[in-house]
Amino acid sequence: MSNRKFGMEGFGINRQTSYSFERSQAPQRLYVPPSSRGGDNSEDADLDNIDYMENEEAEEDIEEGGSAAASGGEVDEIDPLDAFMEGIHQEMKSAPPPKPKEKLERYKDDDDDPVESYLKAKKDLGLTLAADALNAGYNSDEEVYAAAKAVDAGMLDYDSDDNPIVVDKRKIEPITALDHSSIDYEPINKDFYEELESISGMTEQETTDYRQRLGIRVSGFDVHRPVKTFEDCGFSSQIMSAIKKQAYEKPTAIQCQALPIVLSGRDVIGIAKTGSGKTAAFVLPMIVHIMDQPELQRDEGPIGVICAPTRELAHQIFLEAKKFSKAYGLRVSAVYGGMSKHEQFKELKAGCEIVVATPGRLIDMLKMKALTMMRASYLVLDEADRMFDLGFEPQVRSIVGQIRPDRQTLLFSATMPWKVEKLAREILSDPIRVTVGEVGMANEDITQVVNVIPSDAEKLPWLLEKLPGMIDEGDVLVFASKKATVDEIEAQLTLNSFKVAALHGDKDQASRMETLQKFKSGVHHVLIATDVAARGLDIKSLKTVVNYDIAKDMDMHVHRIGRTGRAGDRDGVAYTLVTQREARFAGELVNSLVAAGQNVPPELTDLAMKDGRFKSKRDGRKGGKKGRGGGGGNKGVRGVDFGLGIGFSSESSRTPSSKAAPSRSGAINSVRTGVMAQFKNSFVAATPSNPQNQAYPNKRPSLMGFVSGGTIGGDMGRTQSQAPPVAPTQNASSHNSSQNHSQSSENRPRERKRRSGWDN
């Protein structure tokens, strides 16, 4: 055994100078090259081929030791392990140090920690989205939707200062519109309506009176008369059975006028109060339209496309469409966010005749090639104003660009801002506008009760006191403006043994659908929700709506209370709690109650008078001031006397200060009446002078002339002699030209295709 010393410089080798050979083979022959030894070494040929000495210095030491042994007869012992380790040590000394990896060096930088940077970016993104939602005026649920859409769509970019900004990719990456001129579409039939004798036999005056009773106003060319029963529409026995199964006794106002127009293949702009039955007005004609088309082949469909702004409304329309489609075995698919894209993809790939979707998810499915619009010919945009308010205009345009130009397009909504009308003109062809009631007006079938309370602290005790009586009448829907308030009300009502459920944006789609299903089935009697449930929620057992918090605007208020009093049910009641600090909303609420013919409590009027704008307008209506807004002639919103409500008397409001007003207003009305009569005669001179005394033939030809949406009544039949004598010379010339036009029109064949008043 050798004595080894280990130092920092490596292995040290100390050996004795002589060695006594007691074995038959010398150990050094394994490590000395054959060239340095004499004799035959064939027995060790396999060992001689192994290069143990890779270091040149080690080889020199061995050669010197070998020669010394040969000459002096004495050989130094070389331990194999020591030699091997010495070679490794020398290699380590001569090898260059390894280069540090760039990635590892970057991770060692404390100022650029990837985890810290990621968390910081996420935090900045959340702050940016919150600021955008605040600036956009979103409510609690819309804020959730906006943030989710931004994150899901990857709508994140950075400015020059590396601040995260939200970029709406809907405007950057729309679906390219199809080149319809290069596609050979199969011709389709859109006109399936034939008037029955009971409808075609109505005179113009009878039609006008009937529309007045329904509160219908129409504008457009060749407007069909409204029907009175579902049988007047000519539906098949299968559809009539489905209608009776749903307990539909008679059509609502919007259905009376819209059904014959849609069945005749015309585009429609339908504006009706919430809960008026708009869904059936476009679903029933859609089924007739689809049944006239050839059956779908593999990888074809849909034929009917319905777009809605929210998941809840899309699901509600989906359920309604399934009820009526079951009679013919038509397949209906619902496509909206919150559900599995994979499952929706498979369902669409299997084929369907009707698809109900939100615009965003439908765009996703189109990009995934889950469906094609080559067979689509019936498009419905429901709650169109809400879609445009939520920024869905690019998606709507993209969807429209995928559907054939000669499609039938229907646009239904409860309100119709000017920007929506402008867009409607671009995507609709020669539409007929049907308005039931005032645009954006609350449903008159709903009894509205307003309670003015000192502060928010009195809301919960009031609800706990009134809720048992409300539940006795039916289910109750409570609206709150914040998610935290919803959770608080749910907890308090649960402690008081009420069967309640909550619905807001923080709950996932599956949970929300389960909550709605339990509420509809009677498991829960009270539903507390934010405005996410305000649109499209149709529950027949719902009798009471409570506005625990006021809505953000009157349009949302109208949609909230419209969840009760559905389809003409006059038993609905809507309660609204208003605090002393909500004077501005109180003024708007007074105007809404007046327009709907509801009672205005004095305490609400007193609160509204604290709002400067409302007070100045009211003073202006009274005519007590000569300045801005004065001389209003005691007229309120939409020309309704201020204070009109239950028990209001117009005579009691007259004051001596307004005696001079009638002469001025009478002159203005005379001029207005003369201009309107002249305008209408230029359009309807082709009709007989006395339509009241003449009955129409059994098979009514399409009406000629434009029906103005400015009036409800039958002013069109008024003769020129009834107009006031404003500018006699001009009126006489206009009257003569109208008569000449009438004579020439009677001899000229009627053309169905004419430019409408909607064309620019």
UniProtKB/Swiss-Prot annotation:
Name of protein: DEAD-box ATP-dependent RNA helicase 24
Record's compositionally biased regions (Basic residues): 615-628, 750-760
Domain topic, free-text comment: The Q motif is unique to and characteristic of the DEAD box family of RNA helicases and controls ATP binding and hydrolysis.
Biased composition annotated in UniProt, kind: Polar residues: 14-27, 649-666, 718-732
Residues covered by region (Disordered): 1-76, 90-113, 604-638, 647-666, 706-760
Residue window of motif Q motif: 228-256
Motif annotated as DEAD box, chain positions: 382-385
InterPro entries: DEAD/DEAH_box_helicase_dom (IPR011545), Helicase_ATP-bd (IPR014001), Helicase_C-like (IPR001650), P-loop_NTPase (IPR027417), RNA-helicase_DEAD-box_CS (IPR000629), RNA_helicase_DEAD_Q_motif (IPR014014)
Residues that bind ATP: 272-279
UniProt feature, compositional bias: Basic and acidic residues: 99-109
Keyword Repeat among record annotations: no
Low complexity compositional bias, start-end: 733-745
Family listed: Belongs to the DEAD box helicase family.
CDD domains: DEADc_DDX42, SF2_C_DEAD
Bias kind Acidic residues: ranges: 41-64
GO molecular function term, any single one: RNA helicase activity
Residues with the Phosphoserine modification: 160
Keyword annotations of the record: ATP-binding, Helicase, Hydrolase, Nucleotide-binding, Phosphoprotein, RNA-binding
Signal sequence extent: none
Residue span, Helicase ATP-binding domain: 259-434
Uppermost EC category: hydrolase
